Structure formats: structure tokens, C-alpha cells
């Protein structure tokens, strides 16, 4: 195997180019240029993963890696109750203004009552396993290419609505490759989420 490390796009991405070539694109320690933290939100990169860095451990020909957040180094994913996200989107004047300027962006108000849970696994790669159970019953997990609501609230809205500036490119951003969804049976059920890396 030939691994190589790249950066600059501020997102975490592991791409297996072929059977022997692996690209590790590492998100920046500054995330989205420190801007999400400046707004008293969590420090996030454009993939809505936390600011951080990668750690590579090499033992002979064997290599392992992990992503370490500057906030909680052991945390590898975040889950969202989309019923609660829909409530926030419905009540927020800032969200309404943002969506009025960018109607092509995902309107999470439509998630109300669906009992969906989003899971953002920021260093996900196809060799990882994501298992979600509800009362001992395994739920189907689907990968979804959409935007992360926390990043919209923490970065896009403060950089547009709060400043009264509406960059054209904000209408085309947002799709994340590290988001997964499950459907819970009800709004108050408990889910157990387990993410296992390739090691």
C-alpha cells in the first residue's frame, strides 16, 4: 500500500484510489478558519467534523490512523434527532431568512415527525461499520448525501444572515459524504450507535 497525506480543503476524506493507493485528506486544526468557534458554537470544519488532526501509527509495514478532535479526542461521530432539528428550523427567524435567500438548500423543517436520526461519522471510510440498534433490534443504516444542519447553523447562517451578505456560492454548498440516517420507531426511543473502524 502507498498512503499519502493531503490537505487544504479543510475536510476529512479518505479515498482508496485503488487497491494499493490511499489518500488521507486531513481536515484543518482551524476547521472553517476558526469562524464557527468565534460565534460561540462548536469548532467545525466544512464537513461538520470537529477541528482536529490525524494521528498515524506505523509499526513495520502496518499503519493505523485515527482522527483526534481538539475538543474530545475520542469522539468519532455525532448524532442528531431530526425531530429536534426540524423544531429549531421551524422556530428560527435566521433559518427562515437563510432559506428565503437559498431555497435550493435542504429545508430540515420537512423532517418534522419523521423520527429520523442523522449520524455524521467524520472520518468514515467504506471499511468502517455502523450499527444502530433500538431495543435490541438492528435498524437499517443508509448513507445520505445531504448537508449537516449543525454546520448550517454554526457557519452558513452567521456568515450570511448575521452579516447581511448572501454569497452566491452558499446556494450550492453543503452535501456531505459522511452522513448516515436511521428511522427510529418513535420520537422518544433510545438508540445505541456503534461505529467500528477498519482496525
Regions found by a protein language model. Give the residues of each.
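Long, low-complexity serine/threonine/glycine- and acidic-rich segments characteristic of extracellular
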Residues: 90-199
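Conserved beta-sheet core of the metallophosphoesterase superfamily
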Residues: 1-97, 102, 139-140, 161
Amino acid at each position: 500500500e502507498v498512503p499519502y497525506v493531503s490537505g487544504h480543503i479543510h475536510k476529512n476524506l479518505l479515498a482508496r484510489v485503488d487497491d494499493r493507493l490511499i489518500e488521507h485528506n486531513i481536515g484543518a486544526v482551524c476547521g472553517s478558519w476558526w469562524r464557527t468557534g468565534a460565534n460561540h458554537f462548536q469548532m467545525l470544519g466544512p464537513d461538520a467534523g470537529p477541528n482536529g488532526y490525524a494521528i498515524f501509527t506505523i509499526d513495520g509495514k502496518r499503519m493505523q490512523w485515527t482522527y483526534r478532535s481538539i475538543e474530545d479526542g475520542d469522539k468519532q461521530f455525532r448524532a442528531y434527532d431530526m425531530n429536534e432539528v426540524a423544531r429549531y428550523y421551524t422556530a428560527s427567524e435566521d433559518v427562515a431568512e437563510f432559506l428565503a435567500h437559498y431555497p435550493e438548500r435542504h429545508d430540515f423543517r420537512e423532517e418534522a415527525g419523521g423520527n429520523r436520526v442523522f449520524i455524521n461519522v467524520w472520518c468514515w471510510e467504506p471499511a468502517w461499520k455502523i450499527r444502530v440498534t433500538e431495543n435490541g433490534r438492528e435498524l437499517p443504516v443508509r448513507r445520505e448525501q445531504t448537508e449537516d444542519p449543525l454546520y448550517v447553523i454554526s457557519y452558513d447562517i452567521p456568515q450570511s444572515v448575521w452579516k447581511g451578505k448572501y454569497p452566491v456560492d452558499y446556494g450550492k454548498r453543503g452535501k456531505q459524504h459522511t452522513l448516515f440516517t436511521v428511522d427510529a420507531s418513535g420520537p422518544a426511543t433510545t438508540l445505541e450507535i456503534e461505529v467500528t473502524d477498519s482496525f
